[in-house]
From Swiss-Prot:
GO terms for molecular function: phosphate ion binding. GO terms for cellular component: photosystem II; plasma membrane-derived thylakoid membrane. It is a single-pass membrane protein. One of its GO terms (biological process) is photosynthesis. Keywords: Membrane, Photosynthesis, Photosystem II, Thylakoid, Transmembrane, Transmembrane helix. It holds the Pfam family PsbH. Belongs to the PsbH family. InterPro entries: PSII_PsbH, PSII_PsbH_sf. It is found in: Cellular thylakoid membrane. HAMAP family: PSII_PsbH (MF_00752). The keyword Membrane applies. It comes from the Bacteria. The gene is psbH. This is Photosystem II reaction center protein H.
Amino acid sequence: MAQRTGLGDLLRPLNSEYGKVVPGWGTTPLMGVFMGLFLVFLLIILQIYNSSLILEGFTVTWGG
């Protein structure tokens, strides 16, 4: 027999939706937008690391 806990009682409403699928696209477009923004963020970080993005007055030294 499973033991009841306060955390389990708080999380039970989330688990009650398990297996239910909302018809249509749902939040897929929103996920696509956030994936695109994350890609832009990663590209900016990569350009700073490669020093191909020049920032005025900002020097980057990777040596120890």
